[in-house]
Amino acid sequence: MNQKHLLRFIKKSYRVDADRVVYDAK
């Protein structure tokens, strides 16, 4: 897995986590 792909994967998973946190906070 190259760094660019890894970075994209981290961004995607981070965004999903952030959405989940916002949803739980409501």
UniProtKB/Swiss-Prot annotation:
Q: Which GO terms describe its molecular function?
A: AMP deaminase activity
**EC supergroup of this enzyme:** hydrolase
Q: Which domain of life is it from?
A: Eukaryota
Q: Which reaction does it catalyse?
A: AMP + H2O + H(+) = IMP + NH4(+)
State the pathway, as annotated in the record: Purine metabolism; IMP biosynthesis via salvage pathway; IMP from AMP: step 1/1
Say if the entry is tagged with keyword Hydrolase: yes
Which keywords, in A-to-Z order, does the entry hold? Answer: Hydrolase, Nucleotide metabolism
| Keyword set includes Hydrolase | yes
Q: Quick one: a GO biological-process term for this protein?
A: IMP salvage
> In the Enzyme Commission scheme, what number(s) does this protein have?
3.5.4.6
Subunit text: Homotetramer.
Family membership? Belongs to the metallo-dependent hydrolases superfamily. Adenosine and AMP deaminases family.
Q: What does this protein do?
A: AMP deaminase plays a critical role in energy metabolism.
What this protein is called in its record is AMP deaminase 1
Q: Which organism is it from?
A: Gallus gallus
Q: What would be the name of the gene that encodes this protein?
A: AMPD1
